[in-house]
Curated annotation (Swiss-Prot):
It comes from the Bacteria. Pfam families: GbpA_2, GbpA_D3, LPMO_10. The lineage of its organism: Bacteria, Pseudomonadati, Pseudomonadota, Gammaproteobacteria, Vibrionales. Residues 1-23 form the signal peptide. GO terms for molecular function: chitin binding. Keywords: Chitin-binding, Secreted, Signal. Residues 24-204 form the Chitin-binding type-4 domain. This is GlcNAc-binding protein A. HAMAP family: GbpA (MF_01905). SUPFAM superfamilies: E set domains (SSF81296).
């Protein structure tokens, strides 16, 4: 394997940089870089096909932070953790299969590798390693996956690469390979005991990287979402006159497995290749053959067909979630007693929801409040004790919100608080309701007493006691006073 001994350094175009970040750098293809790193393509689409890596985890927010122990290959990240630099937060990068990551086309020979810096460091070296020709693309990356002699090495003499403009590139001689390979770029900084590890997924084509000139890319099938059974995904084909619906290829999802994002992309690409003469989907080899992928699939248009582009459309089922709350146990009336009035309620939920219940009196004063989270099918009992109990109209207001806090429905139910009912004697069986008219009482006067019974004033000489009552002298009050029997006879 050849190892280049001379490198060409090129300062490239300006890019803005934030001086407040503490992160560092990544392999990019912003200007003339041959390929962006696996981490970079988690955040930025490719410059030509707009492909991106999916399900990357936290690295999609900070591809510049894939930093691990220096000293590769003797030291550095452990086998199986090389792509993520040994950092648990970037462990998704360690996944490795033949179709997991977007691959960038490359050819052997002189190629430019570009770095984007968000904060620069004094630098010892950049080193580039490549997988062996017979490596296993379906096994995690280990030291045994790579030729551990770097095919390119640049000494930088503890200087800082340019930060603004903050892309920096150098030329390397890429050795011969075939098919899918992984390049490991290691930036060894000089002011810490760390290095930055960027793996780059590339593909060597048998014809030296030149795509069959009879085909040009006109679109991309991306696994943007899972689809439900019965939903449809289809191509929208455009020529100079606009959309040509007769060239559309449609896939109806038949089962849950087919609806998984990586599966339907493969199925749609396969169907395109069966149905269309001037459209192909998948990886294109030097023989003009297409291989559908489980994941992103480029869509190609045949030269001379008059076709301009292909977009992807969806016909999705919109299933509105159902929310319903049954409240049982609310009575129309509650009798006021000596203790606080309580509402003993049972709640039954359809759909996941947050429920807020509030009791108001007629004056709109809140007397009780509770919040309950219910899952679909849940049943729960709640007891609401009112802060005060006064006779009259009251309201129970229920507010149903989804799990995002959005109001779904509000309902109000009326009820009343009533005082304990008193059954008076039949009309005409008493003359007064005690103590009304107390000064007019005489022998034979009948009164309705506080205990709801009727009493009759005794004959002389005891009748004189019947009028002896004030709010502070109640001993002759009928039925309840300490000496009531001296003045009164109980009638019922």
């Amino acid at each position: 394997m050849n190892k280049s001994s001379t490198k060409t350094l090129i300062a490239l175009s300006m890019m803005a940089v934030s001086s407040g970040v503490s992160a560092h750098g990544y392999v990019s293809e912003t200007n003339d870089g041959i390929a962006g790193s696996r981490a970079a393509l988690c955040k930025f689409p490719t410059s030509d096909t707009q492909e991106k890596n999916r399900d990357c985890g936290a690295v999609q927010w900070e591809p510049q932070s894939v930093e691990g122990p220096e000293g590769f290959p003797e030291k550095g990240p452990a086998d199986g953790q090389i792509a993520g630099a040994g950092l648990v937060q970037f462990s998704e990068l360690n996944e490795q299969t033949a179709d997991r990551w977007v691959k960038r086309p490359i050819t052997a020979g002189a190629q430019t590798f570009e770095w984007t810096f968000t904060a620069n460091h004094v630098t010892r070296t950049w080193k580039y390693y490549m997988t062996k020709q017979n490596w296993n693309p379906n096994a995690v990356l280990t030291r045994d996956s790579f030729d551990l002699t770097p095919f390119c090495e640049l000494e930088y003499n503890m200087e800082k690469p340019p930060l603004y403009p903050n892309t920096f590139s150098h030329e390397c001689i890429v050795p011969e390979r075939e098919g899918y390979q992984v390049i490991l770029a290691v930036w060894d900084v000089g002011d810490t005991a760390a290095a930055f590890y960027n793996v780059i997924d590339v593909k060597f084509d048998g014809n030296g990287g030149v795509v069959d000139p009879t085909w040009s890319q006109g679109g991309q099938i991306n696994p943007t979402r899972d689809l439900n059974v019965g939903e449809r995904v289809f191509t929208r084909v455009f020529d100079a006159s606009g959309e040509n619906v007769s060239l559309s290829t449609e896939l109806v999802i038949e089962n849950e497995t087919q609806g998984q994002a990586n599966n339907w992309t493969h199925a749609l690409a396969t169907k395109i290749n069966k149905e269309q003469q001037n459209i192909g989907a998948g990886q294109l080899n030097d023989k003009g053959e297409f291989s559908p992928q489980y994941g992103p699939n480029p869509v190609y248009l045949k030269a001379g067909s008059g076709l301009k582009s292909v977009e992807i459309g969806y016909q999705l089922e919109t299933v509105e979630p159902v929310y319903h709350l049954d409240i049982e146990g609310l009575a129309s009336e509650y009798t006021i007693g000596d203790s606080a009035t309580e509402l003993d309620l049972s709640l039954y939920a359809t759909g996941d929801m947050n429920v807020e219940l509030t009791v108001y009196n007629h004056g709109k004063e809140a007397l009780a409040n509770t919040n309950v989270t219910l899952k679909d099918g849940d049943a729960k009992s709640v007891v609401m004790a009112l802060s005060k109990s006064e006779k009259g109209h009251h309201m129970l207001v229920s507010r149903i919100k989804n799990m995002d806090g959005e109001l779904i429905k509000q309902d109000m139910s009326d009820f009343h608080l009533v005082e304990e009912a008193v059954t008076p004697p039949p009309s005409g069986d008493f003359d007064f309701v005690f103590p009304e008219g107390v000064k007019d009482y005489k022998a034979g006067t009948k009164v309705l007493a506080e205990d709801s019974n009727v009493y009759q004033c005794k004959e002389f000489p005891y009748s004189g006691y019947c009028v002896q009552w004030t709010e502070t002298a109640t001993n002759f009050a009928p039925g309840v006073g300490s000496d009531w029997s001296m003045a009164w006879d109980k009638v019922n």
